[in-house]
Amino acid sequence: MAKVSIKLTKSVIGTKPNQRKTVEALGLKKIGQVTEKEMTPQLRGMIDVVQHLVEVKEI
């Protein structure tokens, strides 16, 4: 599996509760915070839910 870098680029203020929980489940709390994860189908789905809040790059 490929590794991806996920960066929170926008605030979760004003977003739906499920989007906030998804961002938290990705391991992101603050704007600009970056986490690295293995790309899985589950992770792809989580990224799709919050694609307007995060930036994803393959490593």
From Swiss-Prot:
The gene is rpmD. GO terms for biological process: translation. Belongs to the universal ribosomal protein uL30 family. It holds the Pfam family Ribosomal_L30. This is Large ribosomal subunit protein uL30. It comes from the Bacteria. GO terms for cellular component: cytosolic large ribosomal subunit. Part of the 50S ribosomal subunit. GO terms for molecular function: structural constituent of ribosome.
